[in-house]
Amino acid sequence: MNRLISPSIYSVLHQLRSRGEWLPADCGGDGSCGRCGVQIVEGHLPVTDADRLFYSQNKLEAGFRLACQAIPSTSVVVQIQEQPVAGIQEQKDAGTEKIRFVIAVDIGTTTLALQLVNEETGIPVRTALRLNPQRAFGADVITRIQKAMEGSFEIMHRILREELLNAIRELVTGIHENQVMGVSVACNTTMRYFLEKRLPDSLGRHPYSVEDVGTKYLPFSTVFEDSFLSCPIKLLPCLDAFIGSDVVAGLLHLNFLQKQKETLFLDMGTNGELVVGNKHRTVAASAAAGPAFEGGGLSCGMGGIPGAIDAVWLERGALQVTTVEQLPPIGICGSGVVDAVALGRNQGWILEDGRLAERITGNALEIWSSVGGTPIVLDQQDIRKIQMAKSAIRAAVECLLQAANLRAEEVEEVILAGGFGTHLRPRSLATLGLLPGELAKKSRFAGNTALAGAADAWIRNDADICMEQFLRQTTTFSVAEFPGFQSLFMTHLAFSLE
Protein backbone atom coordinates (compact mmCIF):
# COMPACT_ATOMS: atom_id res chain seq x y z
CA MET A 1 0.00 0.00 0.00
CA ASN A 2 1.44 3.36 -1.05
CA ARG A 3 0.97 6.48 1.06
CA LEU A 4 1.77 10.12 0.28
CA ILE A 5 3.59 11.79 3.17
CA SER A 6 3.79 15.58 3.35
CA PRO A 7 6.82 17.61 4.46
CA SER A 8 6.54 18.09 8.21
CA ILE A 9 8.35 18.37 11.51
CA TYR A 10 6.56 15.13 12.45
CA SER A 11 7.77 11.64 11.60
CA VAL A 12 6.27 9.38 8.95
CA LEU A 13 4.99 7.16 11.76
CA HIS A 14 3.25 10.11 13.42
CA GLN A 15 1.60 11.14 10.15
CA LEU A 16 0.39 7.60 9.46
CA ARG A 17 -1.04 7.37 12.98
CA SER A 18 -2.91 10.63 12.50
CA ARG A 19 -4.70 8.94 9.57
CA GLY A 20 -5.62 5.91 11.64
CA GLU A 21 -2.92 3.60 10.22
CA TRP A 22 -1.19 1.75 13.02
CA LEU A 23 2.18 0.33 12.05
CA PRO A 24 3.67 -1.94 14.72
CA ALA A 25 6.12 -0.06 16.94
CA ASP A 26 7.06 -2.39 19.76
CA CYS A 27 9.44 0.18 21.27
CA GLY A 28 6.76 2.87 21.23
CA GLY A 29 8.45 4.77 18.41
CA ASP A 30 11.94 5.45 19.77
CA GLY A 31 13.80 3.63 16.98
CA SER A 32 14.98 0.63 18.97
CA CYS A 33 12.80 -2.23 17.68
CA GLY A 34 12.95 -1.89 13.89
CA ARG A 35 9.32 -2.92 13.38
CA CYS A 36 7.90 0.19 11.69
CA GLY A 37 9.72 -0.15 8.38
CA VAL A 38 8.52 1.54 5.19
CA GLN A 39 10.02 1.66 1.69
CA ILE A 40 10.43 4.83 -0.36
CA VAL A 41 8.58 4.68 -3.68
CA GLU A 42 9.05 8.33 -4.71
CA GLY A 43 11.07 11.10 -3.09
CA HIS A 44 13.80 11.08 -0.47
CA LEU A 45 14.21 10.37 3.24
CA PRO A 46 17.68 10.71 4.76
CA VAL A 47 19.30 7.65 6.29
CA THR A 48 19.43 7.80 10.10
CA ASP A 49 21.71 6.01 12.55
CA ALA A 50 18.75 3.84 13.58
CA ASP A 51 18.19 2.85 9.94
CA ARG A 52 21.80 1.67 9.71
CA LEU A 53 21.30 -0.56 12.74
CA PHE A 54 18.39 -2.44 11.20
CA TYR A 55 19.01 -2.39 7.44
CA SER A 56 21.85 -3.61 5.25
CA GLN A 57 23.41 -1.25 2.71
CA ASN A 58 21.40 -2.94 -0.05
CA LYS A 59 18.16 -2.37 1.87
CA LEU A 60 19.04 1.27 2.54
CA GLU A 61 19.77 1.81 -1.15
CA ALA A 62 16.41 0.16 -1.93
CA GLY A 63 14.72 2.83 0.20
CA PHE A 64 13.95 1.06 3.46
CA ARG A 65 13.58 3.39 6.46
CA LEU A 66 12.17 3.32 9.99
CA ALA A 67 8.96 5.35 9.94
CA CYS A 68 9.43 6.56 13.51
CA GLN A 69 12.80 8.16 12.67
CA ALA A 70 11.99 9.47 9.18
CA ILE A 71 11.29 13.24 9.15
CA PRO A 72 10.24 14.28 5.60
CA SER A 73 11.56 17.64 4.37
CA THR A 74 9.78 17.17 1.03
CA SER A 75 6.79 15.17 -0.14
CA VAL A 76 7.50 11.45 -0.33
CA VAL A 77 5.54 8.34 -1.27
CA VAL A 78 6.22 5.31 0.91
CA GLN A 79 5.01 1.74 0.76
CA ILE A 80 3.75 0.20 3.99
CA GLN A 81 3.23 -3.48 4.56
CA GLU A 82 -0.37 -4.47 5.13
CA GLN A 83 -0.72 -6.18 8.49
CA PRO A 84 -2.10 -9.74 8.20
CA VAL A 85 -5.38 -10.09 10.10
CA ALA A 86 -7.72 -13.03 10.06
CA GLY A 87 -11.32 -12.32 9.26
CA ILE A 88 -14.31 -14.29 10.42
CA GLN A 89 -13.94 -18.05 10.68
CA GLU A 90 -17.19 -20.01 10.53
CA GLN A 91 -17.25 -23.07 12.79
CA LYS A 92 -20.97 -23.87 12.68
CA ASP A 93 -24.08 -22.60 10.98
CA ALA A 94 -25.48 -19.71 13.02
CA GLY A 95 -28.88 -21.38 12.75
CA THR A 96 -32.32 -19.90 13.23
CA GLU A 97 -33.53 -16.75 14.94
CA LYS A 98 -34.50 -18.83 17.99
CA ILE A 99 -30.88 -19.49 18.96
CA ARG A 100 -29.41 -17.29 21.69
CA PHE A 101 -25.75 -16.32 21.67
CA VAL A 102 -23.05 -14.91 23.89
CA ILE A 103 -19.99 -13.10 22.56
CA ALA A 104 -16.77 -14.19 24.28
CA VAL A 105 -13.85 -11.75 24.12
CA ASP A 106 -10.17 -12.18 24.98
CA ILE A 107 -8.27 -8.88 24.91
CA GLY A 108 -4.60 -9.74 24.73
CA THR A 109 -1.65 -7.39 24.59
CA THR A 110 -0.82 -8.58 21.08
CA THR A 111 -4.05 -10.09 19.71
CA LEU A 112 -7.80 -9.76 20.12
CA ALA A 113 -9.88 -12.93 19.90
CA LEU A 114 -13.67 -13.03 19.83
CA GLN A 115 -16.20 -15.83 19.44
CA LEU A 116 -19.92 -16.01 18.87
CA VAL A 117 -21.02 -18.93 21.04
CA ASN A 118 -24.32 -20.81 21.19
CA GLU A 119 -25.52 -20.06 24.73
CA GLU A 120 -27.33 -23.36 25.11
CA THR A 121 -24.67 -25.74 23.77
CA GLY A 122 -21.50 -23.72 24.40
CA ILE A 123 -20.38 -24.46 20.83
CA PRO A 124 -18.54 -21.63 19.00
CA VAL A 125 -20.25 -20.55 15.80
CA ARG A 126 -17.88 -17.86 14.54
CA THR A 127 -14.43 -16.65 15.53
CA ALA A 128 -12.76 -13.30 14.83
CA LEU A 129 -9.04 -12.66 15.30
CA ARG A 130 -7.51 -9.19 15.18
CA LEU A 131 -4.23 -7.56 16.06
CA ASN A 132 -4.43 -5.25 19.04
CA PRO A 133 -4.02 -1.79 17.46
CA GLN A 134 -2.26 -0.57 20.59
CA ARG A 135 0.82 -2.42 19.26
CA ALA A 136 1.59 0.90 17.59
CA PHE A 137 2.37 2.27 21.07
CA GLY A 138 4.56 -0.59 22.29
CA ALA A 139 4.80 -4.37 22.47
CA ASP A 140 4.28 -4.68 26.23
CA VAL A 141 1.93 -3.18 28.79
CA ILE A 142 4.64 -1.20 30.60
CA THR A 143 5.57 0.67 27.42
CA ARG A 144 1.89 1.34 26.72
CA ILE A 145 1.28 2.62 30.23
CA GLN A 146 4.19 5.01 29.75
CA LYS A 147 2.76 6.20 26.42
CA ALA A 148 -0.66 6.66 28.02
CA MET A 149 0.88 8.79 30.76
CA GLU A 150 2.67 10.89 28.14
CA GLY A 151 -0.60 11.97 26.55
CA SER A 152 -1.69 9.11 24.28
CA PHE A 153 -4.31 7.62 26.62
CA GLU A 154 -7.40 8.91 24.79
CA ILE A 155 -6.33 7.62 21.39
CA MET A 156 -5.16 4.30 22.87
CA HIS A 157 -8.56 3.80 24.47
CA ARG A 158 -10.40 4.80 21.30
CA ILE A 159 -8.54 2.55 18.87
CA LEU A 160 -8.96 -0.47 21.17
CA ARG A 161 -12.68 0.20 21.59
CA GLU A 162 -13.22 0.72 17.86
CA GLU A 163 -11.30 -2.42 16.85
CA LEU A 164 -13.36 -4.52 19.26
CA LEU A 165 -16.58 -2.91 18.08
CA ASN A 166 -15.76 -3.60 14.43
CA ALA A 167 -14.98 -7.24 15.23
CA ILE A 168 -18.27 -7.60 17.13
CA ARG A 169 -20.18 -6.12 14.19
CA GLU A 170 -18.63 -8.73 11.89
CA LEU A 171 -19.41 -11.55 14.31
CA VAL A 172 -23.11 -10.76 14.50
CA THR A 173 -23.68 -10.16 10.78
CA GLY A 174 -27.00 -11.75 9.83
CA ILE A 175 -28.04 -12.24 13.46
CA HIS A 176 -30.78 -10.22 15.14
CA GLU A 177 -29.52 -8.08 18.01
CA ASN A 178 -32.06 -9.66 20.37
CA GLN A 179 -30.33 -13.03 19.87
CA VAL A 180 -27.16 -11.74 21.57
CA MET A 181 -27.68 -12.14 25.31
CA GLY A 182 -24.38 -10.73 26.49
CA VAL A 183 -20.69 -10.05 25.96
CA SER A 184 -18.22 -11.72 28.34
CA VAL A 185 -14.75 -10.16 28.48
CA ALA A 186 -11.47 -11.66 29.70
CA CYS A 187 -8.30 -9.59 29.55
CA ASN A 188 -5.14 -8.68 31.36
CA THR A 189 -5.49 -5.99 34.00
CA THR A 190 -3.97 -3.20 31.91
CA MET A 191 -6.35 -3.88 29.02
CA ARG A 192 -9.25 -3.80 31.50
CA TYR A 193 -8.25 -0.29 32.55
CA PHE A 194 -8.02 0.84 28.93
CA LEU A 195 -11.38 -0.71 28.05
CA GLU A 196 -13.09 1.02 30.98
CA LYS A 197 -11.34 4.27 30.05
CA ARG A 198 -9.40 4.39 33.28
CA LEU A 199 -5.85 5.72 33.27
CA PRO A 200 -3.59 2.76 34.20
CA ASP A 201 -0.96 4.87 35.96
CA SER A 202 -1.02 2.85 39.20
CA LEU A 203 -0.24 -0.34 37.24
CA GLY A 204 3.06 1.07 36.01
CA ARG A 205 4.69 1.95 39.31
CA HIS A 206 5.34 0.34 42.67
CA PRO A 207 3.32 -0.96 44.54
CA TYR A 208 1.30 -1.70 41.34
CA SER A 209 -2.06 -1.26 43.03
CA VAL A 210 -5.42 -1.99 41.41
CA GLU A 211 -8.92 -0.76 42.17
CA ASP A 212 -12.36 -2.02 41.22
CA VAL A 213 -11.30 -5.01 39.11
CA GLY A 214 -13.89 -7.51 40.32
CA THR A 215 -16.74 -8.94 38.26
CA LYS A 216 -18.74 -6.11 36.79
CA TYR A 217 -21.80 -5.80 34.53
CA LEU A 218 -22.06 -2.71 32.32
CA PRO A 219 -24.41 -1.62 29.52
CA PHE A 220 -23.02 -2.22 26.04
CA SER A 221 -23.38 1.48 25.22
CA THR A 222 -21.33 2.49 28.28
CA VAL A 223 -18.29 0.50 27.19
CA PHE A 224 -18.46 0.94 23.41
CA GLU A 225 -20.25 4.30 23.14
CA ASP A 226 -22.54 2.62 20.62
CA SER A 227 -25.96 1.07 21.14
CA PHE A 228 -26.25 -1.28 18.16
CA LEU A 229 -26.46 -4.07 20.77
CA SER A 230 -28.54 -3.65 23.92
CA CYS A 231 -27.14 -6.58 25.91
CA PRO A 232 -25.00 -6.26 29.06
CA ILE A 233 -21.24 -6.70 29.15
CA LYS A 234 -19.68 -8.88 31.85
CA LEU A 235 -16.13 -7.95 32.80
CA LEU A 236 -14.49 -10.91 34.50
CA PRO A 237 -12.45 -10.41 37.69
CA CYS A 238 -8.71 -9.77 37.81
CA LEU A 239 -6.54 -10.91 40.71
CA ASP A 240 -3.97 -8.10 40.77
CA ALA A 241 -1.97 -5.85 38.46
CA PHE A 242 -0.27 -8.79 36.75
CA ILE A 243 -2.77 -11.67 36.99
CA GLY A 244 -5.75 -10.67 34.90
CA SER A 245 -9.14 -12.11 34.13
CA ASP A 246 -7.66 -13.95 31.14
CA VAL A 247 -5.92 -16.26 33.62
CA VAL A 248 -9.00 -16.51 35.84
CA ALA A 249 -11.14 -17.42 32.82
CA GLY A 250 -8.58 -19.95 31.61
CA LEU A 251 -8.52 -21.76 34.95
CA LEU A 252 -12.32 -21.77 35.01
CA HIS A 253 -12.39 -23.45 31.61
CA LEU A 254 -9.85 -26.06 32.72
CA ASN A 255 -11.71 -26.78 35.98
CA PHE A 256 -8.40 -26.10 37.67
CA LEU A 257 -9.95 -25.85 41.12
CA GLN A 258 -11.32 -29.37 40.86
CA LYS A 259 -7.86 -30.90 40.36
CA GLN A 260 -6.51 -33.11 43.13
CA LYS A 261 -3.02 -33.33 41.63
CA GLU A 262 -0.44 -30.58 41.45
CA THR A 263 -0.86 -28.85 38.10
CA LEU A 264 1.19 -26.13 36.41
CA PHE A 265 -0.61 -23.69 34.11
CA LEU A 266 1.29 -21.35 31.77
CA ASP A 267 -0.47 -18.68 29.74
CA MET A 268 2.25 -17.89 27.24
CA GLY A 269 1.14 -14.42 26.26
CA THR A 270 3.18 -11.24 26.34
CA ASN A 271 2.87 -11.09 30.13
CA GLY A 272 3.57 -14.78 30.76
CA GLU A 273 1.24 -15.68 33.64
CA LEU A 274 1.98 -18.84 35.65
CA VAL A 275 -0.14 -20.72 38.21
CA VAL A 276 0.67 -23.89 40.13
CA GLY A 277 -1.49 -25.78 42.60
CA ASN A 278 -4.69 -27.77 42.93
CA LYS A 279 -8.17 -27.48 44.46
CA HIS A 280 -6.74 -26.63 47.87
CA ARG A 281 -4.19 -23.90 47.17
CA THR A 282 -2.74 -21.99 44.22
CA VAL A 283 0.30 -19.78 43.74
CA ALA A 284 0.53 -17.36 40.82
CA ALA A 285 3.09 -15.04 39.26
CA SER A 286 3.86 -13.38 35.95
CA ALA A 287 6.98 -12.94 33.85
CA ALA A 288 7.58 -10.20 31.31
CA ALA A 289 8.24 -12.56 28.42
CA GLY A 290 7.40 -10.19 25.58
CA PRO A 291 5.31 -11.10 22.53
CA ALA A 292 7.79 -13.44 20.77
CA PHE A 293 5.84 -16.63 21.57
CA GLU A 294 2.75 -15.03 20.01
CA GLY A 295 4.75 -14.14 16.91
CA GLY A 296 4.93 -10.50 17.96
CA GLY A 297 8.06 -8.44 17.40
CA LEU A 298 9.58 -11.00 14.99
CA SER A 299 10.54 -10.12 11.43
CA CYS A 300 8.05 -12.60 9.93
CA GLY A 301 6.02 -13.31 13.07
CA MET A 302 2.26 -13.27 13.55
CA GLY A 303 -0.44 -14.79 15.73
CA GLY A 304 -1.94 -18.20 15.09
CA ILE A 305 -4.09 -17.02 12.20
CA PRO A 306 -4.81 -18.79 8.89
CA GLY A 307 -1.63 -19.01 6.82
CA ALA A 308 0.76 -18.83 9.78
CA ILE A 309 3.40 -21.57 9.85
CA ASP A 310 2.56 -23.61 12.94
CA ALA A 311 4.91 -26.60 12.65
CA VAL A 312 8.43 -27.07 11.27
CA TRP A 313 10.41 -30.30 10.87
CA LEU A 314 13.21 -31.83 8.81
CA GLU A 315 12.43 -34.56 6.29
CA ARG A 316 15.03 -36.03 3.91
CA GLY A 317 17.29 -33.07 4.48
CA ALA A 318 14.65 -30.43 3.66
CA LEU A 319 12.57 -28.22 5.95
CA GLN A 320 8.87 -29.04 5.94
CA VAL A 321 6.09 -26.84 7.31
CA THR A 322 2.37 -26.86 7.94
CA THR A 323 0.17 -23.79 8.31
CA VAL A 324 -2.99 -22.91 10.17
CA GLU A 325 -5.95 -24.07 8.04
CA GLN A 326 -3.47 -25.35 5.40
CA LEU A 327 -3.31 -21.99 3.61
CA PRO A 328 -0.20 -20.70 1.78
CA PRO A 329 2.42 -19.48 4.30
CA ILE A 330 2.33 -15.76 5.12
CA GLY A 331 4.35 -15.75 8.36
CA ILE A 332 5.18 -17.84 11.39
CA CYS A 333 3.34 -18.15 14.73
CA GLY A 334 4.53 -19.25 18.15
CA SER A 335 4.34 -23.01 17.74
CA GLY A 336 6.26 -22.76 14.46
CA VAL A 337 8.86 -20.56 16.13
CA VAL A 338 9.38 -23.09 18.94
CA ASP A 339 9.77 -25.92 16.40
CA ALA A 340 12.13 -23.91 14.18
CA VAL A 341 14.47 -22.80 16.95
CA ALA A 342 14.52 -26.27 18.53
CA LEU A 343 15.30 -27.81 15.14
CA GLY A 344 17.96 -25.19 14.47
CA ARG A 345 19.60 -25.98 17.79
CA ASN A 346 19.49 -29.74 17.19
CA GLN A 347 21.01 -29.34 13.72
CA GLY A 348 23.73 -26.99 14.89
CA TRP A 349 22.36 -24.05 12.88
CA ILE A 350 21.86 -22.16 16.14
CA LEU A 351 24.68 -22.28 18.68
CA GLU A 352 24.29 -22.67 22.43
CA ASP A 353 24.76 -18.94 23.00
CA GLY A 354 22.03 -18.12 20.47
CA ARG A 355 24.26 -17.05 17.60
CA LEU A 356 23.60 -18.37 14.13
CA ALA A 357 26.31 -20.73 12.93
CA GLU A 358 28.78 -19.27 10.43
CA ARG A 359 27.53 -21.60 7.69
CA ILE A 360 24.07 -19.96 7.83
CA THR A 361 24.08 -17.37 5.07
CA GLY A 362 22.31 -14.04 5.14
CA ASN A 363 22.29 -13.81 8.95
CA ALA A 364 18.90 -15.53 9.01
CA LEU A 365 17.45 -19.02 9.20
CA GLU A 366 15.18 -19.49 6.18
CA ILE A 367 12.04 -21.41 7.14
CA TRP A 368 10.12 -21.24 3.87
CA SER A 369 10.43 -19.63 0.46
CA SER A 370 8.74 -19.69 -2.92
CA VAL A 371 9.76 -18.59 -6.39
CA GLY A 372 9.36 -14.83 -6.56
CA GLY A 373 7.99 -14.64 -3.01
CA THR A 374 9.36 -13.10 0.17
CA PRO A 375 11.04 -15.79 2.29
CA ILE A 376 9.87 -16.43 5.83
CA VAL A 377 12.88 -16.31 8.13
CA LEU A 378 14.09 -16.05 11.70
CA ASP A 379 16.96 -13.58 11.82
CA GLN A 380 19.52 -13.06 14.55
CA GLN A 381 17.44 -10.41 16.31
CA ASP A 382 14.41 -12.72 16.26
CA ILE A 383 16.42 -15.49 17.90
CA ARG A 384 17.66 -13.09 20.58
CA LYS A 385 14.06 -12.14 21.40
CA ILE A 386 13.07 -15.80 21.61
CA GLN A 387 16.11 -16.43 23.80
CA MET A 388 15.08 -13.67 26.22
CA ALA A 389 11.46 -14.81 26.30
CA LYS A 390 12.22 -18.47 26.94
CA SER A 391 14.72 -17.58 29.66
CA ALA A 392 12.18 -15.35 31.43
CA ILE A 393 9.57 -18.13 31.37
CA ARG A 394 11.99 -20.88 32.41
CA ALA A 395 13.37 -18.82 35.31
CA ALA A 396 9.84 -17.87 36.38
CA VAL A 397 8.75 -21.53 36.38
CA GLU A 398 11.62 -22.45 38.67
CA CYS A 399 10.87 -19.51 41.00
CA LEU A 400 7.19 -20.46 41.08
CA LEU A 401 7.97 -24.03 42.07
CA GLN A 402 10.28 -22.77 44.82
CA ALA A 403 7.60 -20.39 46.10
CA ALA A 404 5.09 -23.26 46.17
CA ASN A 405 7.64 -25.58 47.82
CA LEU A 406 7.30 -28.07 44.97
CA ARG A 407 9.79 -30.11 42.96
CA ALA A 408 9.34 -30.63 39.22
CA GLU A 409 8.68 -34.34 39.70
CA GLU A 410 5.76 -33.52 42.04
CA VAL A 411 3.91 -31.68 39.26
CA GLU A 412 1.74 -34.22 37.50
CA GLU A 413 0.42 -32.12 34.62
CA VAL A 414 1.56 -29.04 32.70
CA ILE A 415 -1.02 -27.08 30.68
CA LEU A 416 0.15 -24.51 28.13
CA ALA A 417 -2.24 -21.88 26.81
CA GLY A 418 -2.07 -18.80 24.63
CA GLY A 419 -1.77 -17.64 21.05
CA PHE A 420 0.95 -20.11 20.01
CA GLY A 421 -0.98 -21.62 17.12
CA THR A 422 -2.50 -25.08 16.97
CA HIS A 423 -0.13 -27.31 18.91
CA LEU A 424 3.20 -27.59 20.70
CA ARG A 425 5.65 -30.49 20.65
CA PRO A 426 6.97 -31.47 24.11
CA ARG A 427 10.29 -32.42 22.50
CA SER A 428 10.67 -28.92 21.04
CA LEU A 429 9.85 -27.35 24.41
CA ALA A 430 12.57 -29.40 26.08
CA THR A 431 15.14 -28.71 23.34
CA LEU A 432 14.43 -25.00 23.48
CA GLY A 433 14.82 -25.11 27.27
CA LEU A 434 11.47 -23.45 27.82
CA LEU A 435 10.61 -26.18 30.32
CA PRO A 436 12.76 -28.73 32.14
CA GLY A 437 12.59 -32.12 30.45
CA GLU A 438 10.74 -33.51 33.47
CA LEU A 439 7.93 -31.00 32.92
CA ALA A 440 8.02 -30.86 29.11
CA LYS A 441 7.07 -34.53 28.81
CA LYS A 442 4.00 -33.91 31.00
CA SER A 443 2.81 -30.94 28.97
CA ARG A 444 -0.20 -30.47 26.74
CA PHE A 445 -1.41 -27.50 24.72
CA ALA A 446 -4.92 -26.28 25.56
CA GLY A 447 -5.26 -23.42 23.05
CA ASN A 448 -6.87 -20.11 23.96
CA THR A 449 -8.29 -21.00 27.36
CA ALA A 450 -9.07 -17.36 28.14
CA LEU A 451 -11.48 -17.14 25.20
CA ALA A 452 -13.14 -20.45 26.04
CA GLY A 453 -13.31 -19.43 29.69
CA ALA A 454 -14.96 -16.13 28.85
CA ALA A 455 -17.82 -18.07 27.27
CA ASP A 456 -17.94 -20.44 30.26
CA ALA A 457 -18.13 -17.47 32.62
CA TRP A 458 -21.41 -16.44 31.00
CA ILE A 459 -22.92 -19.89 30.46
CA ARG A 460 -21.95 -21.90 33.55
CA ASN A 461 -24.06 -21.50 36.68
CA ASP A 462 -21.07 -22.13 38.95
CA ALA A 463 -18.74 -19.72 37.14
CA ASP A 464 -18.82 -16.84 39.61
CA ILE A 465 -18.37 -19.16 42.60
CA CYS A 466 -15.36 -20.85 40.98
CA MET A 467 -13.71 -17.58 40.00
CA GLU A 468 -14.19 -16.11 43.48
CA GLN A 469 -12.71 -19.24 45.04
CA PHE A 470 -9.59 -18.83 42.91
CA LEU A 471 -9.26 -15.19 43.95
CA ARG A 472 -9.55 -16.15 47.64
CA GLN A 473 -7.14 -19.08 47.69
CA THR A 474 -4.37 -17.70 45.47
CA THR A 475 -1.20 -16.06 46.68
CA THR A 476 0.97 -14.05 44.31
CA PHE A 477 4.55 -12.83 44.30
CA SER A 478 6.83 -10.74 42.11
CA VAL A 479 9.10 -12.92 40.00
CA ALA A 480 11.47 -10.02 39.32
CA GLU A 481 11.99 -9.54 43.08
CA PHE A 482 12.26 -13.26 43.89
CA PRO A 483 15.69 -14.25 45.27
CA GLY A 484 17.76 -15.87 42.55
CA PHE A 485 15.57 -14.88 39.60
CA GLN A 486 18.24 -12.81 37.86
CA SER A 487 20.78 -15.60 38.26
CA LEU A 488 18.34 -18.16 36.86
CA PHE A 489 17.49 -15.82 33.99
CA MET A 490 21.14 -15.48 33.01
CA THR A 491 21.69 -19.23 33.31
CA HIS A 492 18.78 -20.12 31.05
CA LEU A 493 19.67 -17.68 28.28
CA ALA A 494 21.74 -20.47 26.79
CA PHE A 495 20.12 -22.97 24.42
CA SER A 496 21.48 -25.94 26.36
CA LEU A 497 20.38 -29.28 24.95
CA GLU A 498 18.55 -31.22 27.69
Regions found by a protein language model. Give the residues of each.
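Phosphate/ATP-binding catalytic cores across multiple sugar-kinase/actin-like superfamilies
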Residues: 162-171, 247-250, 254, 387-409
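Conserved phosphate-binding catalytic cores of ATP/NTP-utilizing and phosphoryl-transfer enzymes
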Residues: 85-100, 230-263
